[in-house]
Regions:
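Short amphipathic alpha-helical segments at helix-loop
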Residues: 6-11, 38, 83, 136-140, ...
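Amphipathic alpha-helical repeat elements characteristic of tetratricopeptide repeat
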Residues: 20, 96, 119, 195-199
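Conserved amphipathic alpha-helical segments that form helical-bundle/coiled-coil interaction surfaces
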Residues: 86, 112-184, 198-210, 214-229
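Short helix-capping/hinge motifs at transmembrane helix termini and TM-loop junctions
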Residues: 107-108, 164, 188
Length: 274
């Protein structure tokens, strides 16, 4: 099932307990797409790969189950969590509602320092996306997707953390963890998906800069809703194909189309919504 290269080095987690280290290393392997939805997790193999006993692996699985990343079945059989199409639609309906609300509340009170941070994260994402569009090397692309995922999480987390409601923020974090296993796989196979998502981040950032909470919330809801067909396509076929996703309501992004999307976003933030 696994190889030692699949997990991050123990050295990175040297100040943690063994169980915490196992949790973090497994979580990274899952959210970065090295372990994919539905994949069986064999405790003894993981313990051997990480050079630990089975006990901390077993305890780590319980933590990951609470985060929604792992499903444990009778007789201690564990799998990377996966969702049905109906579950994806239900989960994203709730995410769209809550994350739209959190975004609106954040933009209503956002500070210059917080906007500056979002701009910095976006600019870093811009650099990664540029590389992904230029380079065909699988290793470089894989590393780029990992970097983009980290920045993507930072961008979204920063938008929700300042919403003024810790329970709303915590609930969003839990819901986002439920689909974290799908983020790398739906982006790894389609640069069109990466480009469209990045363009939507541009619109969201522009609305934040102009202090347009309702516009920002609307753009965030659109951003989330348009992720659903890609995840469902992965569930149906194993990985999303741009043409197939397009047939279910998505469209590829060419340079011209991306420019038009950005224009639309800029027009949106110039409306009279406050």
């Amino acid at each position: 099932m696994s190889s030692p290269m699949k997990y991050q080095s123990q050295d990175k987690f040297e100040h943690q307990t063994i169980e915490q280290s196992v949790v973090q290393r497994l979580q990274a392997a899952i959210t970065q797409g090295h372990l994919v939805p539905g994949q069986k997790l064999v405790y003894s193999e993981i313990a051997e790969d990480m050079n630990v006993s089975v006990t901390p692996v077993r305890e780590a699985m319980k933590t990951l189950q609470a985060l929604g990343l792992v499903t444990i079945r009778p007789h201690r059989t564990a799998f990377v969590s996966y969702l049905t199409e109906d579950q994806v639609e239900q989960l994203y309906a709730l995410r769209t509602l809550l994350e739209g609300l959190a975004t609106q509340r954040t933009v209503e009170r956002i500070t210059d320092a917080e906007i500056s941070h979002l701009k910095q994260v976006y600019e870093e994402m811009d650099g990664v996306v540029e590389v992904l569009n230029r380079v065909a090397n699988d290793i470089v692309r894989s590393e780029g997707i990992v970097s983009l995922q980290r920045l993507h999480n930072d961008f979204h987390s920063s938008l929700y953390a300042s919403c003024g409601n810790q329970y709303l923020d915590q609930t969003i974090r839990l819901l986002r963890s439920q689909v974290a296993t799908y983020w790398p796989v739906i982006n790894r196979y389609s640069i069109q998906r990466v480009n469209k998502s990045h363009s939507q981040h541009f619109g969201i950032l522009s609305a934040c800069e102009q202090h347009k909470p309702l516009v920002t919330a609307r753009l965030m809801r659109t951003h989330l809703q348009e992720t659903v067909p890609w995840i469902i396509e992965h569930i149906r076929t194993g990985h999303p194909q741009a043409g197939e996703a397009e047939a279910r309501g998505m469209r590829d992004i060419t340079t011209t189309e991306e420019f038009r999307f950005r224009q639309d976003a800029e027009l949106a933030v110039s409306e009279d919504e406050k």
